[in-house]
């Protein structure tokens, strides 16, 4: 069985049912060309294949893994082609600010700053902007949002042991 590493906030989003997809960079552009020519499918080259059961890598042994999911779809797209709906499926969510007013989008991977017992987080005007910040917080050099790399898009569903 294959594993996938997520940060603490992403694991919580999976447990809450808010995260049902993730993206990984395609480093070899020739793969994209073969898929576009329809001589191959994303499943031919992706690390995770449709139907694979994957466990969330934690400090436990694989046999003790708490979170399992099944890959239900794999596709290829440019990173910046992500839809607002897919941003939400990647763990971005709307939240209420402390005043109770409806605020912009925020993703909890942004570290809050506490000043005089008030928690400040980074808020964004759209799902798209929040996802851009999330991506750049985790991306390797040469694969930042601005580089707009091709990515495998993995959709998944949680499964029970």
Regions found by a protein language model. Give the residues of each.
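Secondary-structure transition motif
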Residues: 1-161
């Amino acid at each position: 069985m294959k594993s996938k590493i997520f940060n603490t906030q992403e694991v919580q989003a999976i447990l809450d049912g808010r995260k049902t997809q993730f993206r990984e960079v395609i480093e070899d552009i020739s793969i994209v060309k073969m898929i576009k020519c329809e001589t191959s499918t994303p499943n031919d080259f992706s690390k995770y294949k449709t139907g694979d059961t994957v466990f969330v890598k934690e400090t436990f042994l694989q046999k003790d893994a708490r979170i399992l999911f099944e890959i239900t779809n794999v596709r290829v797209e440019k990173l910046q082609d992500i839809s607002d709906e897919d941003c939400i499926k990647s763990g971005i969510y709307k939240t209420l600010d402390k005043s109770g007013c409806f605020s912009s989008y925020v993703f909890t991977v942004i570290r809050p700053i506490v000043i005089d017992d008030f928690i400040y987080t980074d808020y964004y005007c759209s799902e798209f902007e929040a996802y851009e910040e999330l991506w750049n917080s985790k991306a390797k050099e040469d694969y930042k949002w601005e580089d707009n790399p091709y990515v495998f898009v993995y959709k998944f569903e949680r499964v029970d042991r």
